[in-house]
Amino acid sequence: MKRPKLKKASKRLSCAKRYKIQKKVREHNRKLKKAAKKQGISRKAKKDIGVPNSAPFKEEVLREAEQRKQELETLKEQNKIVKQQEKAAKRKKEKDAASSVKEPAAKKAKKAAKIKEARAAIVKVKSAKTFKCQELNKVIEASDVIVEVLDARDPLGCRCPQLEEMVLKHEGKKKLLFILNKIDLVPKDNLEKWLHFLEAECPTFLFKSSMQLKDRTVQQKRQQRGTNAVLDHSRAASCFGKDFLLQTLNDLANKKEGETMLKVGVVGFPNVGKSSIINSLKEMRACNAGVQRGLTRCMQEVHITKKVKMIDSPGILAALSNPGSAMALRSLQVEEKEESPQEAVRNLLKQCNQQHVMLQYNVPDYRSSLEFLTTFAMKHGLLQKGGVADTELAATTFLNDWTGAKLSYYSRVPERQGLPSYLSDAIVTELQSDVDMDAVKKGNENVKRSVRFPNLASCISFDSSGPTAGVLDVSELPKEILTKAATTTDAEEEKMDTTTNTDEPEAESHISSTVEPIQEPTEKRKDKPAKEVKFVPVNTDLTSMQNKNNEDAYDFNTDFV
């Protein structure tokens, strides 16, 4: 009986009814067991009694049983693998049958993509160097004053005789200046010797670029000045040599005839600090600068003052005739994948004092560059899978230290053996007459007093290989690259022509093949046959089934409804 205001009926029964149900269930189960016993069906699994201890060959019997068990397991595993292979072969067969129509178009598209990538890579290698040469020549032509930036750690190796000769022999009588950058990475005595050596040939300015500049737009700078906000003096606090360099450039601009601005071209090898000097003078990040070499790829004009405009230039291309150590520091062969980092480190370590390198990097004695890189990688945690030292990454990190603005090393000043062939006493006096040398020397002294120099014992001694030859004309580029690029492009074009002529009917399929990778998943779903749903009739009448199997089965519906 259903109770009022309740959804479920009560489960309470009288004791007579409950006992009667239990009795009928017991009788029913007893009859089922009796029938199963007649048919020989037993629900309980027979217990393995094992091998008795009194058996004479117990160990052999157990061993044979274990062997049979393993054989059954291996057989089961083999059957499983065979089934998986059959399923995989069946799927592959269906996939091949479905994609057999599209295979010619897909092959042609893949081949065309490979040819396009190869051609783009060749054009990139060919055009990058020629473009840099053209941009460097544009900077020299457009500039009134050429500033050659030299790394104070190796000033002689940063000099390019071809560039200096081109500037001094130019028809426009351009002025040449030297800037010794990164002076905080060399000992003071070594810096003074280099300054004395360079001042005998050209006016030289000491400079330390700022490393704390942030990206700030002109609008933000105007708002800061207009609101009289507190200036962030720490942004250019680490820059030294800016004031007297700007004063010299302003004096040269005042001496210039006409009202045009003085254009100052900043040139030098990669990663000597050209863009950093311009950013320090501008007091904001106007040019892209960083540890990576070759970031500047085209000329860029930056207005410093109302009278001075500086032009940033890409790095000078180093000629292949230079020694290996010079190419490791002054060229972009490692970045352009023309030389391995390990080979560059090997050439570089030959020119270094081994004891100084061991003290600087805190590594034990090494017999080869590979041993040094392995120890260096282990010490800095540069490991591959399995704990193997990643020597390539270690070599790249080592090169970044040498070309960046952190590692302190110095090169010895050579004995003077006269002026270079493109310089004379008259040219030197003319270069020095354009600049107030007393003010320059005074400014250099102030910079030396302000900068904190490293100790000689904490620096690495480096043997410079002398001036680095540069490539300034496109015709002076290695002909192997240009001829190789030309032949490969011609060969690829001929290959493309032959493929297009032989497969003319497939022109439309080539166009559609570019879209095929996007449509491929949907096509796979279409090709896959849909599973047929089979409806099996099932008799849901429990009473009829039970009566059919056993007429004496208990029925709750008939007795208790």
Swiss-Prot record:
Gene3D superfamilies registered for this protein in UniProt: 1.10.1580.10, P-loop containing nucleotide triphosphate hydrolases
Subcellular compartments: Nucleus; Nucleus, Nucleolus
Coiled coil: 53-98
GO CC entries: nucleolus; nucleus
GO biological process: exonucleolytic trimming to generate mature 3'-end of 5.8S rRNA from tricistronic rRNA transcript (SSU-rRNA, 5.8S rRNA, LSU-rRNA); neural retina development; regulation of cell population proliferation; regulation of exit from mitosis; regulation of neuron differentiation
Residue span of region Disordered: 28-58, 76-110, 486-532
CDD domains associated with the record: Nucleostemin_like
Residue stretches making up the CP-type G domain: 133-319
Composition bias type Basic and acidic residues, residue spans: 76-88, 521-532
Residues engaged in binding GTP: 181-184, 268-275, 312-315
Disulfide cross-links: none
GO molecular function: GTP binding
Family recorded in the similarity comment: Belongs to the TRAFAC class YlqF/YawG GTPase family.
PANTHER family from the UniProt entry: GTP-BINDING PROTEIN-RELATED, GUANINE NUCLEOTIDE-BINDING PROTEIN-LIKE 3
Entry domain remark: In contrast to other GTP-binding proteins, this family is characterized by a circular permutation of the GTPase motifs described by a G4-G1-G3 pattern.
Primary role: May play a role in regulating cellular proliferation.
Protein name: Guanine nucleotide-binding protein-like 3
Organism of this sequence: Danio rerio
Taxonomic lineage: Eukaryota, Metazoa, Chordata, Craniata, Vertebrata
Gene encoding the protein: gnl3
